[in-house]
Swiss-Prot record:
Residues modified as Phosphothreonine: 221
A Gene Ontology cellular-component term: nucleoplasm
InterPro entries: Rrp14/SURF6_C (IPR029190), SURF6 (IPR007019)
Pfam family, one: SURF6
GO MF annotations in UniProt: DNA binding; molecular condensate scaffold activity; RNA binding
Region (Disordered): 19-100, 121-218, 292-353
Name used for this protein in its record: Surfeit locus protein 6
Compositionally biased tracts (Basic residues): 44-53, 139-157, 206-216
Ranges of biased composition (kind: Basic and acidic residues): 72-86
Annotated organism of origin: Bos taurus
Name of the encoding gene: SURF6
Annotated family: Belongs to the SURF6 family.
Amino acid sequence: MTSLLAKDAYLQGLAKKICSQPSAEPQKRKSAGKTQVSEAAAPPRKKRKKAQKKSRERERKTAKPKAQASAEKSEARKPEVAKEEEGATSSTRVPADGLAAEPDSLFALDVLRQRLHEKIQEARGQGSAKELSAAVLEKRRRRKQERDRKKRKRRELRAKEKAAKALEGAEATEPDLQVPREEAQAQPGLLFNKVEVTEEEPANKAQRRKEKRQKLKGNLTPLTGRNYRQLLERLQARQARLEDLRDRDAGQAQELEAKMRWTNLLYKAEGVRIRDDERLLQEALKRKEKRRAQRQRAWEKRTAHVVGKMQQRQDQRRQNLRKKKAAKAERRLEKARKKGRILPQDLERAGLA
């Protein structure tokens, strides 16, 4: 009976402990909150400056300063270790009354959340504007302006692309309507500056000669051109043949003369200038020979002038060289006279030679 009562008391106590014990995560949060609150509430600790930069010579000479430094370190660490142990024990201790610890844990969580939020804002660069400097604010303003400018540019590009697509669609529909207009405009009554180019091969020499003979009218070559001497000789030869034919057969000579006149008229009708007047040909030949003689005289005069100029420049050059040579010799003589030499030229001038 006593064993059953003991077992029942043991199970009831165990159930109370399990029910009263909080979960693992709140315990950790409570301990962290308590430690942080205690640290925040506690006065700032005075950190002792440790003598870390000691010279190597003193360490080599004596070991006593080392022992003292190690003793000081151990003494300085003892209160810290004791405080840590106290914090750990206080965190591990479960309060008998769980409702009394809840306000402290909630306050610690709020403090932690506030600190975390502040750190996140500082990392993002979105802290309060009062704490930021003017350079940071200017930098933010420039970044914002750059973002706005890029947005506007992207918006303009999208608008241009839409307009181009709309224009292409309109052009695709317009050609069907423009084709009849172009066909109607392509039927004028007269066309100017229309040049038809054929891909014919150039004619050879025999073909050109044949075409030239076909162009002749009455097998009579027209008296055209500016070779007045040749035209005059041809005209005189034609007149001599007519005189010879007139002596033999007057009728045939008249027929040939009429044929020649008619052929000349046909050539003149086509716009060819016929030079069949012997007097005019002789005058033209005289004028041409006169102009040729004038050009010949002008050319000869020009060549003579050029040759004279060249000779004049050559003579001037030679004269300048002689003067330069004489001046050089005179300078040498002057130098010799300054040195006290007696020259034969001076003796001749003095009449002592």
